Design a protein with these regions (language model features):
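A detector of single, family-specific signature residues
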Residues: 1-401
């Protein structure tokens, strides 16, 4: 058996080919194009048996290796950072370490589990969605910062400053002087022109807040121009986000196991089930145990033992997008599942913070998801509560909202 470690980079890749006895047979560098891939293929075809270890599970090189049906393993970057002897990044050294760990059958070298095309598509959309959220937050923070400097009342008129109604108001009335000149009828007319659904609830409040005397900035022209620049960007990203949500739900519903995911309480909300499928995937062999999924999702704590001492810590090394998806699912489930709501309250009563209590609930859900996933069974709330009662565990103490 031969072992190949590949240190991935943007434009080139360092390779280390190791024999079964640990001797280095070859250390070369290939380019990130078909010329380099063909050079790699020529090297591998000359070997009777070879296993490949690489740091990432996506990208053109990984796709090409999968298409060529090579035996592929993944060692995540955070593991490599921890396992480096000197903690210093070195491409050739990393390629050697990848081959070395694979030769030792290290537990951190995980077999590559190919996902379906639908899950791969959904995961790509989920990454885009996360980046859109980050960009929207960045632009929104700029808008808030500018308004605080010269127009703070605009932050209080609507539920959020980056909603379409708020952006439309700022576009028509970009200065506090223009806003204060509005009559009651003018505010009502604006809301009706924007087809605002909550006119009766918001009209009096908006008008009253505009009548409160406001401090004036000595110079505000620069702030106004910045706000005018941000408005179309935030409006565009709002529409893109909504379109992305529709596309993600469309792709999710095309997956053969969509109904299985939707059987869990709280997953019918926007993207709740879609994000779980995107980040967990549909390769059942990827997580050999429930604990493997819980650790991957970051819901299970890390337990450290030394002699007679034992300490439990928050798990930092995990898939952070999966943790966010699991936390969101746990929050949504409390509104639709009596036992989930009672379990959360029980953790609060034990003195846990809301964040930790919700994470504990997410950890329970990850175990349930893994178990039913392996059994290919639909979630049944009544059956689950009966199982908890039979095992002497806490049963439903509160009705779901």
């Amino acid at each position: 058996m031969h072992y190949l470690g590949i240190d991935w980079a943007t434009d080139k890749h360092d390779l280390c080919l190791m024999a079964d006895d640990g001797s280095i047979l070859s250390q070369i560098e290939i380019t990130h194009d078909m010329v380099g891939f063909n050079e790699l293929n020529k090297l591998l075809k000359a070997l009777p048996d070879v296993k490949i270890n690489i740091e990432r599970s996506d990208g053109l090189l990984v796709d090409w290796l999968v298409q060529q049906k090579y035996d592929l393993y993944i060692t995540p970057p955070h593991v490599m950072a921890y396992r480096r002897p000197t903690r210093v990044k070195d491409d050739k050294g990393d390629a050697f370490l990848l081959a070395y760990l694979l030769r030792l059958k290290d537990a951190d070298c995980r077999p590559y589990n190919a996902q379906s095309h639908t899950v791969t598509h959904l995961k790509q959309l989920a990454r885009t969605y996360n980046r859109v959220i980050v960009e929207q937050r960045r632009l929104c923070n700029q808008l808030i910062d500018n308004l605080r400097r010269y127009y703070p009342v605009a932050l209080t008129l609507f539920t959020k400053v980056n909603t379409l109604i708020s952006l439309a108001f700022l576009e028509q009335y970009p200065t506090p002087e223009q806003a204060q000149s509005l009559t009651y009828e003018g505010v009502e007319r604006f809301l009706r022109e924007q087809h605002y659904r909550y006119i009766q609830q918001r009209l009096d409040l908006v008008y009253a807040r505009l009548q409160v005397p406001m401090p004036q900035a000595s110079v505000q022209a620069g702030y106004v121009e910045h706000v005018k620049m941000l408005i179309p960007l935030l409006r565009m990203i709002h529409h893109q986000r909504q379109a992305l949500i529709k596309e993600m739900n469309k792709v999710f519903l095309s997956h053969p196991e969509a109904d299985w995911w939707l059987s869990f309480p709280g997953t019918k909300g926007p993207l709740t089930a879609a994000l779980l499928l995107a980040w967990i995937g549909d390769a059942r062999t990827r997580f050999p145990t429930a604990n493997a999924l819980q650790a991957y999702a970051g819901t299970a704590p890390v337990t450290r033992r030394s002699g007679k001492s034992k300490s439990v810590h928050f798990r930092k090394a995990c898939s952070h997008p999966t943790r966010r998806a699991a936390d969101n699912f746990a929050r949504q489930s409390r509104r639709h599942s009596g036992w989930a709501r009672a379990y959360f309250q029980h953790r609060l009563d034990r003195g846990h913070s809301p964040a930790r209590a919700n994470r504990d609930l997410a950890n329970r859900w990850m175990k349930i998801i893994w178990t039913l996933w392996q059994r290919r069974e639909i979630y049944d709330e009544i059956k689950h509560v009966a199982n908890r009662s039979r095992k002497g565990q806490q049963v439903v103490l509160a009705e779901a909202v």
